[in-house]
C-alpha cells in the first residue's frame, strides 16, 4: 500500500481518536487558513505549512475502507479550501495593485469608488472606457444637472475634477468613477426620494450592482455605450425641459417666472389652477434641485398626479386631462409624504378609524373637555376587545398627554364623516389615501395645507364616478348606495398609479413656474462650486 496516500488518513484518524459521535463540524476557511495581508506595493503572505485536519465525529464509526474514503474526502475538501483561499488572496493582491495604479494615474484627484473603478480597469486590461464622445457628452449633461442640485457635494467635486483633467487615461478613470456614482443614484433615487431629495446631505455615493456594471461594460465593448447612457435619462418631458433650461443659466442667476391663471390649466400635471404660483425669480440651484425631484415621475401620461405645494390633483388618461381638482394636503407639522402607489379600491360611505396620532393629539383633549362630542360626531369608543364603551364612563383627562390610549375610536359613515362620502385606497405604509370631506368650504382658501397628511379631494364625487363607471356601476346605482349609507368597497379595474410629489420650480412649455415652499424644503440648498461655463462647453 502506498504510504504517502495513508498519511492523510493517519492524520485524520489521529485527530478524531477522542472525538465523540456528533454531527460533522466544518472549520470555516478563515480559521483553517490564516489570511494574507496585502500592503501595496509590497505583499506579505503568511501561509501555513499544513492545514489542520477538521475534526470528524463520523470517521470512527466507519469500517477501515470507509474511513479511507472519508479521510480522502476531508483531505480534498481542505485542499479545495486552500486553493480557493490562495485564489482569493491573489485576486486581492492584484486588485490592490490596480487600485494603487489608478490612484497614481489620477494623481491628487479623489476617487469616489476607487475599488470598484480599479476592478473595472483590471478586468479590462486598463483599456479606455470612454471612446464614445457622444456618450461622454450625454453623461456629463446628466451628471452636471445632478451635481448642481446640491444632493451630493462629493459628486459636484468629482465633476469639477473631470472638467479640470486633460484628455487621457486619467480623465477616462475619473469619468468611470463618476459614472458608477450616477448609475447607483439613478437606480435607487425612486425608493430613496424622501431622504435624498428632501433631506439634503443624506445621499452618499455607493457602487451600483454588479449586474448594472456588467451591462454597461458590455455596451462599451459592443459600441452601444451612447445608447446605454441615453436610456438612463428620464422620459419625463418636464424634467427634460427643466434640465435644458439649466444650461442657459449660470449659478447665482435667477430667471423670470410665470404666474398661473385661474381656470382649467392647459398644461399637464404641474401648473396650479387658482393662482398658487408666484411671480418673481427662481434661482439656478432651486431649479436644479427640483429637476431631480421630477426624476421620480416616469412621465405625465397616465395616473393621478398631486404636486403637494400646488394644492391640485390632475387625473390623466393617455396624456389627456380627465379631471382636475383642488386638494387639501397635510399641514407643515403633519406633511403629506412624497410617494408612489396605485389606487386599489373606492369605498363608498367609508367609516373613519381614527389614527392613534390624531386620537392622542386632537380628539382626547376634546373628549376631556366634553365627552358629549362623541355623540354629536358619531364617534364609537371601542376597548381592546372591540366592545363599545360609554364615552362618559372614561376619565379622558388622564390620557391628555399620553402617547397611547387603551381605546379606539371609529366614526360612523355618513356625510358628516371626516372622510366624507368616498375614500380612495392605495397600499401605503404611511396610511395615506385620498378622500372626500364634509367641509368643502376650505377649498376656497389659497393656503390649503390643512390636513393631517391625507389628501382631501374637492371633486371626489366626479373622481369616484369615473372609477365606479369603469367597474360597471351606473349613476343610479352610485346614488342608491350613497343614500343607503351602507359601506361598500369596489375594486378598481383600470391601472391608476398615484404620484404625490413636491416640486416648487420647473420649466414647462418654455416657461419657468414656481410655487411657495410650504414645507420649507428648498431652504439651505448647497451652492456647489462648478465651472458651469466649462460644463456648457463640453456638452
List the model feature ranges, each with a label.
Residues 1-20:
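Gram-negative bacterial Sec-dependent N-terminal signal peptides
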Residues 2, 27-80, 200, 218-539:
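Well-ordered beta-sheet/strand-loop patches within structured domains
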Residues 11-13, 91, 121, 137-144, ...:
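Generic hydrophobic, helix-prone segments enriched in Leu/Val/Ile
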Residues 16, 179, 424:
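A residue-level signal for conserved active-site and pocket-lining positions in enzyme catalytic cores
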Residues 21-202:
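Cationic-aromatic interfacial patches
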Residues 99-106, 137-146, 206, 387, ...:
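Phosphate-binding glycine-rich loops and adjacent basic patches that engage nucleotide phosphates
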Residues 190, 213-216:
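A sensor for short, sequence-defined functional sites
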Residues 202-213:
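Eukaryote-specific, cytoplasm-facing alpha-helical/coiled-coil scaffolding segments in long proteins
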Amino acid at each position: 500500500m502506498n504510504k504517502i496516500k495513508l498519511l492523510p488518513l493517519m492524520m485524520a484518524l489521529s485527530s478524531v481518536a477522542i472525538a465523540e459521535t456528533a454531527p460533522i463540524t466544518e472549520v470555516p476557511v478563515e480559521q483553517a487558513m490564516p489570511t494574507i495581508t496585502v500592503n501595496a506595493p509590497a505583499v506579505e503572505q503568511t501561509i501555513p505549512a499544513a492545514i489542520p485536519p477538521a475534526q470528524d465525529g463520523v470517521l470512527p464509526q466507519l469500517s477501515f475502507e470507509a474511513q479511507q474514503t472519508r479521510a480522502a474526502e476531508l483531505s480534498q475538501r481542505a485542499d479545495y479550501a486552500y486553493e480557493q483561499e490562495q485564489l482569493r488572496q491573489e485576486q486581492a493582491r492584484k486588485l490592490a495593485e490596480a487600485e494603487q495604479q489608478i490612484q497614481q494615474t489620477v494623481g491628487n484627484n479623489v476617487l469616489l469608488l476607487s475599488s470598484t473603478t480599479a476592478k473595472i480597469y483590471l478586468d479590462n486590461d486598463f483599456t479606455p472606457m470612454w471612446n464614445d464622445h457622444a456618450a461622454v457628452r450625454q453623461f456629463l449633461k446628466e451628471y452636471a444637472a445632478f451635481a448642481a442640485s446640491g444632493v451630493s457635494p462629493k459628486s459636484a467635486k468629482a465633476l469639477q475634477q473631470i472638467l479640470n483633467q486633460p484628455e487621457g487615461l486619467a480623465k477616462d478613470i475619473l469619468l468611470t468613477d463618476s459614472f458608477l456614482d450616477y448609475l447607483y443614484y439613478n437606480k435607487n433615487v425612486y425608493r430613496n426620494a424622501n431622504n435624498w431629495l428632501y433631506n439634503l446631505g443624506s445621499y452618499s455615493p455607493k457602487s451600483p450592482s454588479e449586474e448594472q456594471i456588467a451591462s454597461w461594460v458590455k455596451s462599451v465593448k459592443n459600441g452601444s455605450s451612447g445608447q446605454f447612457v441615453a436610456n438612463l435619462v428620464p422620459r419625463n418631458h418636464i424634467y427634460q425641459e427643466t434640465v435644458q433650461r439649466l444650461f442657459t443659466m449660470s449659478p447665482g442667476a435667477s430667471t423670470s417666472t410665470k404666474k398661473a391663471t385661474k381656470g382649467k390649466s392647459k398644461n399637464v400635471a404641474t401648473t396650479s389652477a387658482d393662482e398658487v404660483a408666484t411671480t418673481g425669480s427662481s434661482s439656478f440651484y432651486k431649479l436644479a434641485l427640483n429637476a431631480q425631484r421630477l426624476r421620480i415621475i416616469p412621465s405625465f401620461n397616465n395616473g393621478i398626479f398631486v404636486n403637494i405645494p400646488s394644492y391640485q390633483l390632475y387625473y390623466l388618461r393617455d396624456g389627456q386631462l380627465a379631471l382636475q381638482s383642488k386638494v387639501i394636503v397635510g399641514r407643515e407639522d403633519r406633511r403629506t409624504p412624497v410617494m408612489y402607489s396605485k389606487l386599489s379600491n373606492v369605498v363608498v360611505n367609508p367609516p373613519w378609524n381614527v389614527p392613534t396620532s390624531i386620537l392622542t393629539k386632537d380628539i382626547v383633549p376634546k373628549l376631556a373637555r366634553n365627552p358629549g362630542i362623541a355623540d354629536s360626531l358619531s364617534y364609537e369608543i371601542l376597548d381592546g376587545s372591540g366592545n363599545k364603551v360609554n364615552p362618559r364612563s372614561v376619565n379622558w383627562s388622564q390620557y391628555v398627554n399620553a402617547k397611547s390610549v387603551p381605546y379606539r375610536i371609529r366614526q360612523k359613515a355618513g356625510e358628516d364623516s371626516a372622510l366624507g362620502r368616498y375614500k380612495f385606497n392605495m397600499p401605503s405604509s404611511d396610511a395615506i389615501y385620498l378622500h372626500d370631506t364634509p367641509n368643502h368650504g376650505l377649498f376656497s382658501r389659497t393656503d390649503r395645507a390643512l390636513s393631517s397628511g391625507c389628501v382631501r379631494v374637492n371633486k371626489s364625487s366626479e373622481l369616484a364616478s369615473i372609477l365606479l363607471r369603469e367597474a360597471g356601476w351606473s349613476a343610479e346605482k352610485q346614488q342608491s348606495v350613497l343614500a343607503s349609507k351602507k359601506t361598500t368597497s369596489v375594486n378598481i379595474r383600470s391601472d391608476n398609479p398615484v404620484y404625490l410629489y413636491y416640486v416648487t420650480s420647473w420649466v414647462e412649455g418654455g416657461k419657468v413656474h414656481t410655487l411657495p415652499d410650504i414645507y420649507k424644503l428648498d431652504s439651505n440648498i448647497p451652492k456647489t462650486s462648478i465651472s458651469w461655463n466649462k460644463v456648457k462647453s463640453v456638452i
